[in-house]
């Protein structure tokens, strides 16, 4: 037999807040959900993401260990 009264209460009209504004009305086990960032204002999802990595990992490795074409041939 299934146990009674073990599941959390489900709220059909829970309010989802982002930066103090109601963004969505969703179903949740909490009455209110607060978030700093969500898909509606995240740079990746709205297309304003900038690539931060300006140099490649291989170039960084070579520079870090002072490897150049002359040194790599002797290895």
From Swiss-Prot:
Main location: plastid
GO cellular component, as recorded: chloroplast; ribonucleoprotein complex; ribosome
InterPro entries: Ribosomal_bL28/bL31-like_sf (IPR034704), Ribosomal_bL31 (IPR002150), Ribosomal_bL31_A (IPR027491), Ribosomal_bL31_sf (IPR042105)
BP terms from Gene Ontology: translation
Domain of life, source organism: Eukaryota
GO MF assignments: rRNA binding; structural constituent of ribosome
SUPFAM superfamilies for this protein: L28p-like (SSF143800)
Location in the cell: Plastid, Chloroplast
Pfam families referenced in this protein's UniProt entry, alphabetically: Ribosomal_L31 (PF01197)
Keyword annotations of the record: Chloroplast, Plastid, Ribonucleoprotein, Ribosomal protein, RNA-binding, rRNA-binding
Role, per record: Binds the 23S rRNA.
UniProt subunit comment: Part of the 50S ribosomal subunit.
Family that this chain belongs to: Belongs to the bacterial ribosomal protein bL31 family. Type A subfamily.
PANTHER family registered for this protein in UniProt: 50S RIBOSOMAL PROTEIN L31, CHLOROPLASTIC, LARGE RIBOSOMAL SUBUNIT PROTEIN BL31C
Protein name as it appears in the record: Large ribosomal subunit protein bL31c
Encoding gene per record: rpl31
């Amino acid at each position: 037999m299934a146990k009674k009264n073990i599941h959390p209460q489900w709220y059909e009209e829970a309010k989802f807040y982002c930066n103090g504004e109601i963004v969505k009305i969703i179903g949740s086990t909490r009455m209110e959900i607060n978030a700093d960032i969500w898909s509606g204002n995240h740079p990746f999802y709205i297309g304003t993401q900038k690539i931060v990595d300006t140099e490649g990992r291989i170039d960084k490795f070579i520079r870090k260990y002072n490897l150049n074409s002359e040194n790599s041939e002797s290895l």
